A protein has these predicted regions:
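A short SAM/SAH-binding and catalytic strip from SAM-dependent methyltransferases
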Residues: 88-101
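Conserved alpha-helix/loop element of class I SAM-dependent methyltransferases that forms part
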Residues: 9-27
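A short glycine-rich, Lys/Arg-flanked "PGG" loop and its adjoining helix->strand segment in the class I
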Residues: 101-113
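Conserved class I S-adenosyl-L-methionine
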Residues: 27-36, 118-148
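Short alpha-helix
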Residues: 165-183
Length: 209
């Protein structure tokens, strides 16, 4: 999943600049879920690791191959890798656009015991900022429908139909429940600066038990 320079600038006050996604020991095999432009894969490679990228967008997957990166096109909910085949996983704000528990379970499945995942999510503050502080009515509607979709999902376990249900924000409570159910433990938790008292981003370092 590609992030534009404009998006980085827009959210700069909330991004945890000290959280290093590429922090894995040399020699590790690391999966980057939603590798986007490949920037993170190159950082992982520069640390002496073998990086493998996964991307659902066909154009980004093609560009990654043309750039010489080891990539495949697939969904986060169906990782085409063997169980316990990865030393590390990077997943940078991909989960909000997936079946979140299934994606978390797949991260746990491909990690070897003792392997680590470095993951970030959208918290509720991300969409509250869209809803309450954005001048563009379309983005305010996007914030509102994501908030409503997540409330509905938390109550029923199902999303709203169609485009209304395409995005969820994550909560610490739901994430901790998924982790407990799929053999992951939190090594480090770093909520970002908040908006209206709610975290905009959530950063977790996880270990496979």
């Amino acid at each position: 999943m590609a992030v534009t320079t404009a998006q980085v600038c827009e959210w700069a006050d909330y991004i945890d600049q000290e959280f290093v996604f590429a922090d894995f020991p040399p020699g590790s095999t690391v999966l980057d879920i939603g590798f986007g432009t490949g920037e993170q894969m190159r950082r992982i490679g520069a640390r002496g690791c073998r990086s493998v990228g996964l991307e659902i967008d066909p154009g980004l997957a093609r560009k990654g191959r043309m750039a010489g990166l080891s990539v495949c096109r697939a969904q986060a909910e169906r990782l085409p890798f063997r169980t316990a085949s990865m030393d590390g996983v990077v997943c940078k704000v991909v989960i909000p656009y997936t079946d979140e528990e299934k994606a978390v379970s797949e991260i746990a499945r491909v990690l070897r015991p003792g392997g680590t995942a470095r993951v970030s999510y959208h918290g509720s503050g991300y969409f509250l900022r869209y809803l309450l502080a954005d001048w563009d009515w379309r983005r305010r509607v996007y914030g509102l429908r994501t908030m409503l979709n997540t409330f509905f999902y938390a109550l029923t376990g199902s999303r709203l139909s169609g485009f209304l249900g395409d995005t969820l924000y994550q909560s610490e409570r739901r994430l901790r429940r998924y982790y407990a159910g799929h053999g992951l433990e939190i090594v480090e938790a770093r909520p970002s600066a908040g908006f209206a008292g709610a975290p905009v981003f959530i950063y977790h370092v996880l270990r496979r038990t």
